[in-house]
Amino acid sequence: WNIDEDMILFGSLPGTSISEIYIESANNYLEAKYQQLHGMDKIHPLILIRNYIKDKGEELFFVEDFARFSGYPLSQIQHYLSNLANKGFVYYDYGEQRIRVLEKLHNYLKAKSGKGDYDVISFKSQVQSSARERRMQINSALNIKTKDLNVLGVPEITLSDSQRVYMYPTGGRIVIKQNRDFVFSGQISAGNGRFSLFGKDFYFHYDSFWVDLNKIDSVQLSVPLEPIRRDMYGYEILTKIKTVIEAVTGDLQIDHPTNKSGLRKDSFPGYPIFRSYEDSYVFYDRKSIYNRVYDRDRVSFHLLPFEIDSLENFTGKGL
């Protein structure tokens, strides 16, 4: 960081061929990661810390005091806590040898116990270049005035694994705003591939868990083959509808704001939901449709504002 400039750069030193960084939501939870943290320990590390802060009544403590409480050697506890710090559960002040418990630790334990909602949002940035290049490999840049975090090298984002909503940013670029909102251009896939949106300047609102689709280029729908056929994973095999919907404006509600984990589907049925705001059109001037014989100025299908819910299970007949 050049203190005379407004940008803080994150990445790897010159000579690195592949630079990777991971950015996670403070409410991110993965069961596999929870189990991985447990390892061979008798007590889960997060539970051990929670027991300590309950006993002492403080979330800021010295490493040595925690080692005595846990009964493990100091050197082992230092490694133990360093690992948790790298994963964002605690802040480790190596100079003072003190620990401050972070929000993510509490969120993880609430998610595990079923007492709190969670999300699966994370960003993996990978930037690759020649190892001969003598410049820093930049994964992200934070503007300290606007608080915008520009991130490069992000090929895919999972917004909801239960609703199967994924984003594919154009050029791997996104701009993360405050409180996990972010802006990107590219493709959104929802409903296990049934519903695909292409466009620019899409704005994801974290708290309300929806996407403002500012500039939609087109909407591509896919439906199950009839009779129903399934792939090796048990998913229905889909076929794309030949025509796409254009001149669309609207939004995509991924799930209820209090059900970002998607675990309470019975309480909040019908998601994901796409809603169009204004009239839209289907044109038939693609080369794949009778070699563009139908000019869009003469032939089109006019759609009034519409809504499609349950994007993961609609059928051709239902449409």
In which residue ranges do the predicted regions lie?
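Structural signature for solvent-exposed beta-strand/loop edge elements and short helix-capping sites
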Residues: W1-L319
